[in-house]
From Swiss-Prot:
ATP binds at residues 37-44. The complex is composed of two ATP-binding proteins (UgpC), two transmembrane proteins (UgpA and UgpE) and a solute-binding protein (UgpB). One of its GO terms (cellular component) is ATP-binding cassette (ABC) transporter complex, substrate-binding subunit-containing. This is sn-glycerol-3-phosphate import ATP-binding protein UgpC. Its EC number is 7.6.2.10. It holds the Pfam family OB_MalK. It is a peripheral membrane protein. The keyword Transport applies. It comes from Salmonella typhi. It is found in: Cell inner membrane.
Amino acid sequence: MAGLKLQAVTKSWGGKTQVIQPLTLDVADGEFIVMVGPSGCGKSTLLRMVAGLERVTSGDIWIDRKRVTEMEPKDRGIAMVFQNYALYPHMSVEENMAWGLKIRGMSKAHIEERVREAARILELDGLLKRRPRELSGGQRQRVAMGRAIVREPAVFLFDEPLSNLDAKLRVQMRLELQHLHRRLRTTSLYVTHDQVEAMTLAQRVMVMNKGVAEQIGTPVEVYEKPASRFVASFIGSPAMNLLDGVISASGDRFELPGGLALPIGAGYRGHAGRKMTLGIRPEHIALSSQAEGGVPLTVDTLEILGADNLAHGRWGDQKLVVRLAHQQRPAAGSTLWLRLPEHQRHLFDGETGQRV
């Protein structure tokens, strides 16, 4: 096994536009890291720099304690799995998996041994003589992974490998990837825009935005304690409710436009008068009553999801989404009285967006 280290890595186009801000990341031996973020955030560019397909503008990349910053891709000890399977249509599954080893000059016996072992791990034993056109999307992606496995790389690089699959296959392949990593324990760097993939596959998640690593942490840490307003809005489905306001002069209330306010703890008195964003996840909002001082939500629409429901509505001029139990189905125009538990709230600086 081998670790991966990025040391103050940057990438600029034309010497001007910096698409990757100075970024440092230590990936332990056998760790599975997922980079997630919206299109254009720099995650695929960063992966390509690790692979050697893009030059680093500044900084260093280390794989298995070796500096590989200027090395060619073939010398870095990596194997890459792409969104597009990139299989040779005229070759069988076995030939596709073996091709990279053949051009490296390995013996036939050694190649056969590696291919058979990879096929066994990926349950492709009965498909080795088939051509790609005879396979399903999930089977083709397993062949692409098998081609990477036979290389026995120091690091696996995955570039949105499940994006071309339908919803059911994506679930199946996520489970297979988890099982594969438990067996191989190979250091892995995985890129996706799908937060469900990120949260279910990763040992640690790196949330990226405009070339910056906004937060690096376990899925639980990123969900429970988002480091910034961006992370709070990106991680979670539906997204966290975000309310813009200001800490009152007395420091004991969060004041919103339209005369609305929420009581807050004494710990924020030092922030009196500061603009803030208050966040709370839809699943953390509780039902209350007018007598208990609840917040009135006028229901606009109801999404019935099966296991639970989402009520979209307004508290004054503020939009809120609340997750309800399956049997709770308020009609449009009705009022729900809500409680926003203080221990479930998050506060972010109104200017920097960073967690307070």
